[in-house]
Amino acid sequence: MRASTILFVLGAAILAVIGVTTALDSGEIDKSTQENHRLLRSGSMEQEPDEERKFIKVPSFMNKAAREAKKAKKKAEIANLVWLKLQKYSDSYALNYVDDMVKSGRSADDEIKFLKKHMKVSNNLQRVIEGHFRSHAELGRVLAKPKYK
């Protein structure tokens, strides 16, 4: 190499070093921010290998909305099941009587006792009625407005 080329490269390196130090001193480049970025990059590479990736956590309000929608869908399916079971194992007089019981304000226990006494209601159906339709107003709403699939 020629001496002029070596001097040219050395001069360019000196100017680059002077420019960086001037920029750091004047505050154009924040040294602590630069170091933080470097540490974050190196730390993230060490903590997350390729075979083990972390997933982003869904915000809780999204989970709650999904849970509520799932509960509502299941409740509607169970309401439909109860209605179909009651129609299968009963006559129209018994369903009218249950509607009258609901309108008169009797409790859910009275309705369940009536269903067990006058219709073929299995223990499983009784648990469904007790668990999901405890209030007589809700049971009355299900019986008054059946939904068929």
From Swiss-Prot:
The RxLR-dEER motif acts to carry the protein into the host cell cytoplasm through binding to cell surface phosphatidylinositol-3-phosphate. Keywords: Host cytoplasm, Host nucleus, Secreted, Signal, Virulence. Belongs to the RxLR effector family. Transmembrane segments: none annotated. It comes from the Eukaryota. One of its GO terms (cellular component) is host cell nucleus. A motif (RxLR-dEER) lies at residues 38-53. It comes from Plasmopara viticola (Downy mildew of grapevine). Secreted effector that completely suppresses the host cell death induced by cell death-inducing proteins. It is found in: Secreted; Host nucleus; Host cytoplasm. Residues 1-23 form the signal peptide. This is Secreted RxLR effector protein 3. Its main location: secreted.
